[in-house]
Every structure is written in C-alpha cells, then in structure tokens.
C-alpha cells in the first residue's frame, strides 16, 4: 500500500511539474488560423494571398497545398505599388516584392512547414518551422541549446513569433473573406 501511494504521489507531482511545459509546447495561436487560411485558399483554388497590415506594412503568402505556407511581412518603398497590386489581386507579385525588396529591418519571413501553424518543436523527424525576423534566423526544432539560447529565451521567442504570425494570418484571412 505504501508503494502504491508513493507511485501515485510521484505521478501527481510529475503531472503538476511537467503539465505547464507540455501545455506550453503544444500551445500555438497560429495553428487554427493557419488551418482556416489553408481551407479558404483551397476553396478558392488560390496559391497566394496578400494584404495590407497595420500602418505601412504588407503581408503576402505562398501556399503549397497541404505542405507549407511561406509568409513574408514588411515595409515596402512604394505603398502605391503595393496598393495597386492588392487592388488587382496580384497577390503573388506582392509576395515576390516583399521577399526581395522590403526593408530588411522590418521584414519577417515565416516558413510554416506543414501549413499547420508554428510548432514549438519538431515532432517525430518532421520538418521544423523557421522564422527570419529583422535579419535574425530562428529554428523552432526544440533545440534551444544548439541555437545558443536559454530555454526561457527560446520560449519567449517562440511565443512572440507565434503571436506575430497569428496577426499576419488574420490579415490574410480578412482579405479572403472580404466581399469582392
């Protein structure tokens, strides 16, 4: 009986200590939004979408059905050109312009491999998501030590990037839901 009580006590303690880590690792604000965006793109048979985000920032995405979303956001030198392309629904052109000519300091580039939102770490030898933010690259593979980051820094970077990515996805979804 004493052994059974000890086993239960250890199990409860483990769940209490590891529960927050596991739930943090599984929490992704962008996951549901990525699924919604992919569904809208599939329904409309589109492989790209773009939008104006807050202020003078623009966001564009390329979609490879079921496999990946490549999303870029940044400031572009000519707002008139971006607005013209958006008006014509030339989303791929917006994406290309942002990828090549947006201000590096403001550029964010997300490679959502799996098109399922950012994942905290790699799962079972699956590809991992990456982000290039203002000229600095991050790999969300769960290997913060290899990236010369503390676990806390990795968690904070992931949470901030996931929040930012969720906002980009919301802008893209709003574009697709807008009546033509």
Regions found by a protein language model. Name each.
Residues 1-12:
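Bacterial N-terminal signal peptides that target proteins for export
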Residues 10-20:
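Bacterial N-terminal signal peptides
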